[in-house]
Amino acid sequence: MEIINSDEINWTELFLNNEFIVVNYQPSLDCIGCKEINDLFEELSLEKKYSKVKFLWVDSRNNPIAEQFIKKRQTPFIAVFKEGFLVECDNISNETGLREMLERLFAFKFKL
């Protein structure tokens, strides 16, 4: 998993070069409930099934929008994108929830 500061992200380039993106917004790497998701991101990023998925951790303290989500909800806060569009976002704190979210991401079809 790539750990980056949201100030260092070129979001346009990221979305243009990656079909599937999963972002874990959290205030630190050791927040309550975050360690399990961080470890799971690492594991999933190595699985062949998820080889086309870009997994990122973004420090929510440097991202005003993410910070507002987290104030109203809990961490870890996961957002999934397909071809640059937000498909789903929610609090996910276990393997089953994250794998189900990824399956919905893969199955998502744009409506014209």
PLM-predicted stretches and their roles:
Residues 74-112:
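Non-catalytic, surface beta->alpha helical segment in thiol-disulfide oxidoreductase systems
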Residues 22, 55, 78-80:
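Structural signal for hydrophobic/aromatic residues that build the beta-strand cores
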Residues 68-74:
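A short glycine-leucine-enriched loop at secondary-structure breakpoints
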Residues 31-34:
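Short cysteine clusters
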